[in-house]
């Protein structure tokens, strides 16, 4: 596991900004690729208003695009305690076929050994508690993944102020999702449809994959003022051999590596740090916390959405493009009514020198 990237002490307030509520996208657009896209040149601090459909114009034959193919599970469950009190369960991470780390919203803290009845069908026992996270054992013959698929609800982020609908089961999932395990979508990937993927392949851009199962910790706020005191959540990732080979070939030919989403970037950069600057196929876990001053070793460009104030993701993009460049970009996005967060618009960022 990794938790490095901070060069000097910075304050959470350095990453704060005011966002009008009406700019928080509550629904996806009619078509995935209808999103706007703000191009940000970190080298020259330039901005350019574009559309996501223009993405191929910024790429060339031999470049690679790295997508996170994790699949969002229906991680939200409602139920009652044995005493009758209501509970809301959000799976944070699946541990094995019957156990998971979860966040629980209830009127009072749960007691170790107590049981819950979820969705009127599933009995779960509280095995352990570590701060805000509980470990639940789901006492059912079906594996947990199948239980969630049958009885769970799409885990929309807390800033989307509505219940999930049947439509969200499709739209809060990328078209290339394969490996079940995430409890939040890798949202930069939501802009892609099959037409865009085929257009990029025809252009000669290589599309490759990593898997990083996004945890509920991605929504947790930074609660400390000095960011070097923040404890980053841990997420599992996997990098296939063909991805390593494609990136090595791209780099040797002078191409650029575009990471789609902060999760793809963190998987690649974590692997590089773990292996002394070498990209190695295999699985690992990361709690890499990237802030200004971090040296990016492999990713040249980043496609990402607009992130929450005071968040670790905003700190990451500030490291990638430069703090002043990102402040300028976010002011521009707000002034020009870009849509923010999971169902919002995109940024394409060229890294700073």
Curated annotation (Swiss-Prot):
EC number(s) from the headed UniProt entry: 2.4.99.17
Entry-linked InterPro entries: QueA (IPR003699), QueA_dom1 (IPR042118), QueA_dom2 (IPR042119), QueA_sf (IPR036100)
SUPFAM superfamilies: QueA-like
Pfam families assigned to the protein according to its UniProt record, in alphabetical order: Queuosine_synth
Reactions it catalyzes: 7-aminomethyl-7-carbaguanosine(34) in tRNA + S-adenosyl-L-methionine = epoxyqueuosine(34) in tRNA + adenine + L-methionine + 2 H(+)
UniProt-recorded Gene Ontology molecular function terms: S-adenosylmethionine:tRNA ribosyltransferase-isomerase activity
Keyword S-adenosyl-L-methionine carried by entry: yes
Keywords: Cytoplasm, Queuosine biosynthesis, S-adenosyl-L-methionine, Transferase
DNA damage is among the record's keywords: no
Major localization class: cytoplasm
UniProt xrefs under Gene3D superfamilies: QueA-like
Subunit structure: Monomer.
Entries under NCBIfam families matching the protein: PRK00147.1, queA
Function in brief: Transfers and isomerizes the ribose moiety from AdoMet to the 7-aminomethyl group of 7-deazaguanine (preQ1-tRNA) to give epoxyqueuosine (oQ-tRNA).
Name assigned to this protein: S-adenosylmethionine:tRNA ribosyltransferase-isomerase
Organism: Nitrosomonas europaea (strain ATCC 19718 / CIP 103999 / KCTC 2705 / NBRC 14298)
Lineage: Bacteria, Pseudomonadati, Pseudomonadota, Betaproteobacteria, Nitrosomonadales
Gene this chain is encoded by: queA
């Amino acid at each position: 596991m990794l938790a490095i990237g901070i060069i000097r002490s910075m304050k959470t307030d350095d990453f704060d900004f005011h966002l009008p509520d009406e700019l928080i996208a509550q629904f996806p657009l009619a078509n995935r690729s209808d999103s706007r896209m703000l191009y940000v040149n970190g080298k020259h601090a330039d901005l350019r208003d574009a559309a996501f459909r223009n993405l191929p114009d910024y790429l060339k034959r031999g470049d690679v695009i790295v997508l996170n193919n994790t699949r969002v599970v229906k991680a939200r469950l409602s139920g009652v305690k044995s005493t009758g009190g209501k509970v809301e369960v959000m799976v944070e991470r699946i541990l094995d076929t019957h156990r998971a780390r979860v966040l629980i919203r209830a009127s009072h803290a749960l007691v170790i050994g107590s049981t819950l009845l979820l969705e009127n069908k599933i009995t779960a026992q509280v095995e352990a508690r570590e701060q805000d996270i509980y470990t639940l054992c789901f006492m059912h013959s079906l594996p947990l993944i199948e239980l969630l698929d049958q009885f769970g609800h799409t885990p929309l982020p807390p800033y989307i102020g509505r219940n999930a609908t049947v439509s969200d089961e499709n739209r809060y999932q990328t078209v290339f999702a394969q490996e079940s395990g995430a409890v939040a979508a890798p949202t930069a990937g939501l802009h892609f449809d099959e037409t865009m993927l085929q257009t990029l392949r025809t252009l000669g851009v290589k599309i490759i994959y990593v898997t990083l199962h996004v945890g509920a910790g991605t929504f947790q706020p930074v609660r400390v003022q000095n960011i070097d005191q923040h404890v980053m959540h841990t997420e599992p990732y996997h990098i296939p051999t063909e991805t390593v080979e494609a990136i090595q070939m791209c780099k040797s030919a002078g191409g650029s590596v575009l990471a789609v989403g902060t999760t793809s970037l963190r998987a690649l950069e974590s692997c590089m740090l773990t292996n002394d600057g070498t990209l190695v196929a295999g699985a690992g876990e990361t709690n890499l916390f990237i802030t200004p001053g971090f040296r990016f070793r492999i990713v040249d460009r980043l496609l990402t959405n607009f992130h929450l104030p005071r968040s670790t993701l905003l700190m990451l993009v500030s490291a990638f493009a430069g703090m002043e460049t990102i402040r300028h970009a976010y002011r521009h996005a707000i002034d020009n009514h870009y849509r923010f967060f999971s169902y919002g618009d995109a940024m394409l960022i060229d890294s700073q020198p």
